[in-house]
Amino acid sequence: MLNLIDETYINKKDKELVEEFLYSFTKKKFILGINKYTKSIQKHVQIDGIIDDFTRVQSSRKKSIYKIDEVPKDALILSVSTGSPLEVKNALDKKGFENINYLSFYKYSKIDKELLVKPPFITDFEDDFKNNKVEYEKVYNLLCDEKSKEIFTKVINFKISFDFDFMQGFTNNHKEQYFDKELVPNIKDIVFLDGGSYVGDTIPQIISNFPDFKKIYCIEPNNLHINIAKKNFSKYENIEFINCGLGNKKIENMTNQKLQNNCAHDYQASNINTIDNLINEKVDFIKLDIEGAEQDALIGAKNTIKENQAILAICIYHKAQDWYKIPQIVLDINPNYKIYLRHYMEGIFETVMYFIPLNSD
């Protein structure tokens, strides 16, 4: 059974620390990390300094930058780390610092949310879950192992609560992302479609996991990024680079305004095409991480999924509705899949839903 927190859940300790960070005149207050969230907080809170052990810069927005060992032990620290939030929290706890993170600050602060930088891929989740509980339950019941169900529950509890306590146990494990040894079988002469290849950062893992690969299609809308990938992997004749976005239909030479009118996601591409149009051979594996355009790309791969029954590794962290609409789309096209869920990062990013063909055992 899906074991979720009550929707009125509050982390009382974090709430109290956020209030102290906002309103205390006696507590020393520091922000750990320098990014857009740091600047957002500084507009509303008078702080005593910024912590960054790795910068040579001595100040930011007229505030001194300190090493962690220079900070008073009774200080309250707000971490803005997005890449390793659990590692940072555990390190601060070990050193004895009271600490909170930006998600707690965003949730419990009484500052108008429109005045704060919005954390990505999470603020739409609570309302969507409330309105579509039945759909989430359906997906939970489709998951094929207990590990998937545990991950499903933990990540949803986190997204509802903004509380990193629910993410304890997750680590940054990018090498296994898309290639989970528990799920993905060995495939000889694989044809691999890398949707959202960026600068080719997944290519080394494809080659490592499938050294006798037949073909890799790298599809990336950003011209600069795909040119970097081409340069880095130019020695491979069987890697093809395609400079376009993926969607549910072919659209050419779109202006920025047309993009806004046609796309309900952040996948900005002047030219969009479908997987069915682009690939004219059997595809064994499709990976998609394309900034919220995954639903459209799957619709545009209808024939490929129906006829090839490729393994699918699809990122579902960009939009709340991806959690249930992506499995709906895939199973409507081809019901002969087992569904699994894995999460490969300490924080918000890198939740992957796997669709493994029933006949893959």
Question: What kind of feature is each model-predicted range?
Answer:
Residues 1-47, 53-75, 79-361:
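Phosphate/nucleotide-binding beta-alpha loop and adjacent structural elements of enzyme active sites
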